[in-house]
């Protein structure tokens, strides 16, 4: 089977790896000069298998109103003329109930835990390195109220058998002694010992090199113009003015996936959630994080690589704008100076932004479509790095008609369709859509 993958970020590259291992002839195309150079380039570096949570959560609507007036708000909305922005926001608000939050988080945890297993197996098989650490993650709470709210997450962690520890202030410093130099005294924290860290871009590029050795063809500098449709089937894509035919096409274009699908009448509710990062040369290891922490108040993570510190997070709903907002840099600098002062060189920091492809419910869109030969692997939001290996392996099983190792419930685009459209992929299990 000849498979054409559109996009060579971490999602497209892991898809290529697993499809190649399944015996497919794989071609990957991307507009950049190499793999992992857009949203995968400088994300937070957290592999948050246990921390997986949707942005749509109880209390977020009221918080969003308050955040409108805060300089360092974790979520901001910049109105555009794009009607899709408002439709997406309205759908997200519908998922902020406790009931929907529990359903969505359970789906995300299912995929994230599977992805942890897949990444561990891939690493053992290939020996791939990406400045990774297996030292867990810590979610820091600045207020007792934040600590009290985490109870609902703990219930789901217990349900899925995910190890966790609720830390007292003294226990926090045991795992992250560098926090003692900071100006904040946290009343408590949640530690997830099975979570990891690593450089997503480094992983993507090294996995692409390994996949190329297996025969996967990577073509860079390629613009995907449109999909080729023959009746009920997608038969390829027009790339740089030429038709590239394939038995199966995988759309892994992140936030740009809906733009390619719209001419086919497929309204995919994926919208850019703009994130920011600041990468600093490390200047004092004793004052740096041992692993990674997430400041819950600002949704900013501080992560340690070998000789670098990555400060990343926040979300800005502002369409496809990729300009660098100096106010967001100020927030990143404020947080790292609060928690790990003196750990990195702010004067030599690399400021970056990326468009994270978010769904209203937080769960990605992986699987079949109403068109034969067309599959999706997109919509991972802030958790593309976390979910990448599991998503790629799961998709390869679907495409190759093999039994999936996890339930497909709620993972494909059919959950968004109001009317019941039967899945045309004969082998891929589809879940009946829900309104």
From Swiss-Prot:
Q: Which Gene3D superfamilies match?
A: D-Amino Acid Oxidase, subunit A, domain 2, FAD/NAD(P)-binding domain
The record's GO CC annotations read: cytoplasm; plasma membrane
Keywords in UniProt for this one? FAD, Flavoprotein, Oxidoreductase
Question: What GO MF terms are annotated?
Answer: D-amino-acid dehydrogenase activity
GO BP terms in the entry: D-alanine catabolic process
Catalytic activity, EC: 1.4.99.-
Residues spanning the signal sequence: none
Pfam short name (any one): DAO
Task: Using the UniProt record, name the top-level EC class of this enzyme in a single word.
Answer: oxidoreductase
Tell me which domain of life the UniProt entry assigns to the organism this sequence originates from: Bacteria
Tell me, in a sentence or two, what this protein's role is: Oxidative deamination of D-amino acids.
Name-wise, this protein is D-amino acid dehydrogenase
Gene behind this protein:
dadA
């Amino acid at each position: 089977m000849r498979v054409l993958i559109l996009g060579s970020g971490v999602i497209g590259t892991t898809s290529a790896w697993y499809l190649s291992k399944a015996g497919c002839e794989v071609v990957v195309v991307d507009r950049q000069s190499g793999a992992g150079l857009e949203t995968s380039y400088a994300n937070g570096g957290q592999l948050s298998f246990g921390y997986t949570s949707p942005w749509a959560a109880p209390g977020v609507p009221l918080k969003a109103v308050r955040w409108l007036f805060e300089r360092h708000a974790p979520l901001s909305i910049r109105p555009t003329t794009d009607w899709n922005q408002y439709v997406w926001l309205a759908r997200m608000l519908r998922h902020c109930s406790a009931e929907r939050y529990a359903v969505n988080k359970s789906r995300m945890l299912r995929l994230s835990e599977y992805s942890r297993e897949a990444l561990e197996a891939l690493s053992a098989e290939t020996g791939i390195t990406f400045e990774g650490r297996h030292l867990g993650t810590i979610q820091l709470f600045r207020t007792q109220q934040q600590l009290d709210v985490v109870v609902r997450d703990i219930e789901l962690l217990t349900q899925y058998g995910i190890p966790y520890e609720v830390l007292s202030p003294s226990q926090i410093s045991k795992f992250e002694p560098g926090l003692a130099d900071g100006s904040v005294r946290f009343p408590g924290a949640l530690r997830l010992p099975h979570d990891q860290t690593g450089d997503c871009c480094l992983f993507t590029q090294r996995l692409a090199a390994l996949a190329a050795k297996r025969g996967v063809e990577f073509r860079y500098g390629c613009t995907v113009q449109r999909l080729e449709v023959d009746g009920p089937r997608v038969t390829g894509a027009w790339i740089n003015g030429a038709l590239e035919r394939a038995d199966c096409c995988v759309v892994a274009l992140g936030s740009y996936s809906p733009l390619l699908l719209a001419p086919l009448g497929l309204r995919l509710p994926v919208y850019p959630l703009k994130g920011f990062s600041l990468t600093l040369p490390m200047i004092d290891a004793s004052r740096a994080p041992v692993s990674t922490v997430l400041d819950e108040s600002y949704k900013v993570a501080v992560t340690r690589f070998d000789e670098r510190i990555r400060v990343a997070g926040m979300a800005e709903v502002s369409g496809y704008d990729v300009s660098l907002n100096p106010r967001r840099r100020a927030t990143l600098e404020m947080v790292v100076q609060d928690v790990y002062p003196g750990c990195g060189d702010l004067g030599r920091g690399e400021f970056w932004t990326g468009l994270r492809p978010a769904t209203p419910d937080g769960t990605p869109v992986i699987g079949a479509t109403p068109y034969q030969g067309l599959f999706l692997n997109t919509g991972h939001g802030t958790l593309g790095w976390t979910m990448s290996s599991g998503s790629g392996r799961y998709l390869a099983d679907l495409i190759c008609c093999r039994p999936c190792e996890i339930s497909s419930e709620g993972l494909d685009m059919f959950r968004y369709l109001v009317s019941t459209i039967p899945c045309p992929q004969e082998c891929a299990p589809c879940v009946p859509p829900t309104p």
